[in-house]
Amino acid sequence: MLKKWLAGILLIMLVGYTGWNLYQTYSKKEVGIQEGQQAPDFSLKTLSGEKSSLQDAKGKKVLLNFWATWCKPCRQEMPAMEKLQKEYADKLAVVAVNFTSAEKSEKQVRAFADTYDLTFPILIDKKGINADYNVMSYPTTYILDEKGVIQDIHVGTMTKKEMEQKLDLD
């Protein structure tokens, strides 16, 4: 009789546990940022110490790039981003958000920017903006239209030509 009670209690606990896990899995709303959504605004300091926000780029297309100095693909695409910034400065804003909490120091980020002669803003992310944008891999690039709406999300390296195509600049 005791064995039947224990088996019944175990069965009820197992069914309850399974039900709870299913509820937790399927009741969650989809998280992350998607194409067609307004890009969340943020404000971060630049390497030069000034405050910069995504709102500063309103009215221009935006190439919002999340990167790190230790990321080889990030290093490969930086020259293309710099060329784009110079060629299309009147209608494009390149915004590079550095994953600063994973860097050895801001000096390392500054040395990187100097090595590549980068003139676009390098934002120092100590607030976890990369997590807000659901960045799981570097580089990750968000393409925004002039109103700040996400048009494309690209994970991995892009060539200048690919950037121009995604930004509809060519």
Curated annotation (Swiss-Prot):
GO terms for cellular component: plasma membrane. Pfam families: AhpC-TSA (PF00578). Residues 33-170 form the Thioredoxin domain. One of its GO terms (molecular function) is oxidoreductase activity. Disruption phenotype: No sporulation-related phenotype. Its main location: membrane. It is found in: Cell membrane. The chain crosses the membrane at residues 5-23. It is a single-pass membrane protein. Keywords: Cell membrane, Disulfide bond, Membrane, Redox-active center, Transmembrane, Transmembrane helix. It comes from the Bacteria. Disulfide bonds join C71-C74. Belongs to the thioredoxin family. This is Thioredoxin-like protein YneN. It comes from Bacillus subtilis (strain 168).
